[in-house]
Every structure is written in C-alpha cells, then in structure tokens.
C-alpha cells in the first residue's frame, strides 16, 4: 500500500498540525513539507501566499492531501479541489501573552499583533493602547516579546497549544467582542475531488460539528465580501441542532464597529453564515469594511456606530 502524501508548510506549527492529521489516518503516511510564498516573504499579501504552493502540488498530483490552518485558506479554492475534512476544533479564541487580563494591561502599553481584526478589537476595547505591527511565526513573536519589542502580544490559543506553549499565555480575550477569525483553531484538509484520498480523509479525519461551523464561518465571510485582511471575525458554535453565530467588522482604529449574532438550523451551515452576513450588512458592516480598506477612510473623527448583541455593550477581557 503506497503512503498517503500530506502536504504542509514547513513551520513548526504547520508540521505539528500535519502530524495531528496523520495520527488520525490508518495506513502509511508521508508528510511532505512545501515552502510557500508566505514563508519566503512575510510582507502583507493575500491568503494564497500561504496556500498557493500547496494547492499547486495538490492539483499536480505531487501530494494527496493539503493540510492548512483553516483561517489562512482563501474563499476560492483551486478548481477540482475542496476542503473535505476538518478534525475536532481546538480553542478558537485569542489569548494575551505578557499579561493575564486586558484590563490589567497598563495605559499606553505596546501591544503586538499583525492582524487588523485584532487591532480593531483591541482599540475598540482599549483606545489608549499603542497597537504595533508584529510579524513572524509563533516562536518569532514570543522572542520579540521577550526582547522588549512589545509589552504584550496577542496570539491564537490553538497555535500555542499545538506547540505545547499554552502555559506561556495569560488570559483568554473575551469572545463577545474579540470574535476570532473565521476558521481559527481549525485544521482544514484539502483534496482533489473525487479521490480516494478525499474519501479516506472524510472517513477518518472529519469531525462533523467542526466542519459545519467552518462552512458557516467561511460562508459569512464570502457573503460579506471581505478581503483577506479585512478586520472581520466570525465564529460559530453548534448547540444541539442549532448554529450559534457571532460576527464582528470594524475599522482598524477601533472607532467604529458592527457586532451581531444569529442562530439558525445546523442543517444548512452555508445559509446560516450568509444570513449572519446579511444582518451585519443591514447594520452597516458593508460601509465599515469599505472604509477599512487602505485609502478609503472617510472624513471625520471617531464616530461610533455599534450593534451590540442583545443590546449589551461588550466587555474587554475574560
């Protein structure tokens, strides 16, 4: 029996994710590290810089499955491929490193992150903070924190856990305002369809509840028309037969945001995600996201136009 070839980026986190997928599949596995454009140049670009080389290898038949961090996968996939499986989701939320609680971070502290979503949420909760761009993989960001380039950094809990470094985290950020990126904490397995590899992944790797949440979250982002770096967060949680969804869209300076939630049948995750997006659009998310694009910030100062779930103002830290 020939080995099933799992393509992955070569970072420590990506390899850990690939090994976790391999452990779920019966039979011989070969993990194939592939260098992506994002590994070579971390300058801001679209999500395909992290996935394009993997997709090309998949389409060419050089690998059987591509293993991704789901939050890095673009909305449009290579023709003839699909996300066919997702193992059980890890913690989807963000954590502080360097402080236990957001309200314990000193006034004016330097907080490091590279995500516009996190920047928008941090400044919405704490406009006094100095949010600095901090790039690199998890290890690099932790080294930069230790070197004093920031007082506190924000990372995904899942990434730290997969590297056995969750003990370095402080508190988890309040998911009411700090809605995570779509797919955060999920490992996405992409395959050519139809294929025996896809069938194997579905049978042994896929966690149905996680896949339903991922489908709903990705559908919401597509329906919002959000670019790959837009300050948008979408989360879904399966509760019995219902999907509990929450969405965030904001300006990078934290001055304006839309926050909404939606509950729908889990029978059609894509429809649930699209409906959350429609609710957010009606509340002004489209205008917020248009102005969040570089060069589109409109005139005026800090204007608030906020939609709070159930009418309650969100807090800043768990």
Regions found by a protein language model. Give the residues of each.
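Glycine/Thr-rich phosphate-binding loops of Rossmann-like dinucleotide-binding domains
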Residues: 76, 121, 163
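Short beta-strand segments
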Residues: 68-69, 97, 112-114, 154-156, ...
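A conserved helix-loop-strand patch within extracytoplasmic ligand-binding domains
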Residues: 70-71, 79-129
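Structured loop/turn residues at beta-strand edges in well-structured enzyme cores
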Residues: 61, 107, 148
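Short, well-ordered beta-strand segments
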Residues: 5-7, 66, 84, 112, ...
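Small-molecule-sensing regulatory modules
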Residues: 1-36, 41-47, 51, 124-318
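N-terminal glycine-rich phosphate/adenylate-binding segment common to multiple enzyme folds
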Residues: 46-94
């Amino acid at each position: 029996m020939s080995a099933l070839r799992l393509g992955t980026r070569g970072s420590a986190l990506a390899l850990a994710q690939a090994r976790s997928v391999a452990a779920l599949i019966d039979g011989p596995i070969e993990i194939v590290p592939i260098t992506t454009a994002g590994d070579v140049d971390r300058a801001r670009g679209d999500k395909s810089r992290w996935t394009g080389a993997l997709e090309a290898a998949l389409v060419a038949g050089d690998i059987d499955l591509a293993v991704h961090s789901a939050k890095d996968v673009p909305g449009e996939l290579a023709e003839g491929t699909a996300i066919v499986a997702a193992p059980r989701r890890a913690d989807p939320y963000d954590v502080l490193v360097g402080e236990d609680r957001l309200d314990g971070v000193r006034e004016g502290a330097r907080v490091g992150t590279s995500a516009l979503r996190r920047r928008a949420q941090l400044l919405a909760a704490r406009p006094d903070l100095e949010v600095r761009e901090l790039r690199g993989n998890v290890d690099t960001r932790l080294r930069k924190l230790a070197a004093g380039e920031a007082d506190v950094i924000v990372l995904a809990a899942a990434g730290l856990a997969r590297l056995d470094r969750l003990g370095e985290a402080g508190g988890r950020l309040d998911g009411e305002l700090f809605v995570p990126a779509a797919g955060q904490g999920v490992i996405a397995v992409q395959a050519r369809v139809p294929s025996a590899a896809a069938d194997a992944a579905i049978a042994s790797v896929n966690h149905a509840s996680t896949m339903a949440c991922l489908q709903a979250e990705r559908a919401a982002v597509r329906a919002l028309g959000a670019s790959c770096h837009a300050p948008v967060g979408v989360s879904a949680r399966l509760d019995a037969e219902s999907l509990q969804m929450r969405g965030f869209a904001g300006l990078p300076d934290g001055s304006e945001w839309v926050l909404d939630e939606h509950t729908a049948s889990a029978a059609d995750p894509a429809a649930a995600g699209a409906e959350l997006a429609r609710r957010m659009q009606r509340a002004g998310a489209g205008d917020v996201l248009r102005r969040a694009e570089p060069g589109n910030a409109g005139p005026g100062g800090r204007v608030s136009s906020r939609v709070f779930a159930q009418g309650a103002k969100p807090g800043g830290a768990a």
